[in-house]
């Protein structure tokens, strides 16, 4: 249950979403995420997530990529040794390529920066939120899947959610939009 403005709300049987933080301080310097349905085959989907991680002086990037094919097979790539995924991400383009177990998957997501929400993220040690994520809820995504060099599936979805996170990046986008200092989010332009 929750209480807001003196009103009591019950949520018995409701579906909920919980965000997993990336560590004690909440989020890495940069991260990316995306998912899409709405392909021509209704049971297909694509999801990915990645980020820059570090422990002391060690730094690396990791990305996981999961694709459900029209025939129901699910492909999971992202093990840095046997099925690595490379990601080149900007605020309006997500380009991923993964290989492993004979599979090759290419994903390209696109969404105009001005149509993104700027969302807050928590800074636990400071007990406050900060602008942190550039979130597109109406992007597009293309996927190409091959196995041992043979085409398996390719499609396009006009229904992709795409995110590029980073505190400095999100603050810069708020300033570009003319949002006052201290605000932690903004609607699309």
Q: What do these predicted regions represent?
A:
Residues 1-189:
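Structured soluble/peripheral alpha/beta segments that form catalytic or ligand/cofactor-binding pockets
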């Amino acid at each position: 249950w929750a209480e807001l403005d003196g009103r009591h709300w019950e949520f018995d049987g409701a579906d909920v979403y919980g965000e997993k933080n990336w560590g004690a301080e909440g989020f890495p310097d940069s991260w990316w995420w995306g998912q899409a349905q709405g392909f021509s085959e209704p049971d297909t989907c694509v999801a990915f997530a990645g980020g820059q991680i570090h422990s002391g002086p060690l730094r690396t990037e990791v990305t996981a990529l999961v694709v459900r094919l029209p025939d129901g097979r699910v492909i999971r790539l992202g093990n840095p040794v046997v099925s690595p995924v490379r990601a080149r991400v900007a605020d309006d383009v997500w380009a991923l390529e993964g290989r492993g177990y004979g599979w090759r998957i290419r994903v390209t997501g696109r969404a105009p920066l001005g149509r993104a929400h700027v969302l807050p993220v928590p800074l636990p040690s400071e007990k406050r939120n900060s602008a942190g994520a550039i979130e597109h809820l109406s992007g597009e995504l293309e996927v190409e899947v091959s196995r041992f060099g043979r085409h398996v599936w390719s499609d396009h979805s006009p229904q992709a959610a795409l995110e590029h996170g980073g505190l400095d990046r999100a603050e810069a986008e708020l300033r570009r939009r003319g949002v006052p200092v201290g605000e932690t989010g903004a609607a699309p332009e």
